[in-house]
Regions:
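DNA replication initiation on ssDNA origins
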Residues: 1-72, 77-90, 128, 135
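Catalytic micro-motifs at enzyme active sites that drive phosphoryl/nucleotidyl and oxygen chemistry
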Residues: 58-65, 95-112
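Histidine-centered divalent-metal-coordination microenvironment in nucleic-acid enzymes
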Residues: 72-75, 102-130
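Long, well-ordered alpha-helical scaffolding segments within enzyme catalytic domains
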Residues: 86-105, 131-137
């Protein structure tokens, strides 16, 4: 379950500008303000608010060994060499298969991004926070 006090690592512009830690709320406000102006990236996982203290003290996210959370599951589907119509059909089939597994439409967000589509799923599989979550996916 999503905790709005959780933090994420955010990169603004150049991918080497790491170690910026923000709450999910701050990150989402920044996306609304900057997304069309500058490149932005965020960590796949979110972290408890103590993660910011760790990064401030160590000046890096490296070797963080606390719990990690999964607020969303992102699936990146690249187009490759197939034609547009076939690719759209493939993506629709992928989404239909998710529906067949019992995932509800309100739990999925789909958008196009130049080379393909992104699917953003809520944590519909109930993955729990843990230190080992990244090894389970």
């Amino acid at each position: 379950m999503e905790n709005r006090e959780n933090t994420v690592e955010v990169v603004y512009g150049d991918i080497t500008r790491r170690n910026n830690i923000e709450t999910l709320d701050s990150y989402e406000k920044a996306v609304k303000k900057n997304a069309w102006k500058n490149e932005m990236y965020r960590s796949y996982y979110s972290f408890p608010k103590e993660f910011k203290d760790y990064v401030d003290e160590n000046e890096s996210v490296k070797q963080y060994n606390g719990s990690i959370y999964l607020d969303y599951i992102y699936i990146d589907i690249d187009k490759g060499d197939i034609d547009d119509i076939s690719f759209q059909g493939y993506v629709m089939d992928c989404v239909s298969q998710l529906f067949d597994k019992g995932i509800m439409a309100e739990d999925i967000n789909v958008w196009f991004s130049g080379n393909g589509y992104h699917l953003k799923l809520k944590n519909v599989f109930g993955l729990q926070p843990s230190k080992e979550l990244n090894t389970k996916l």
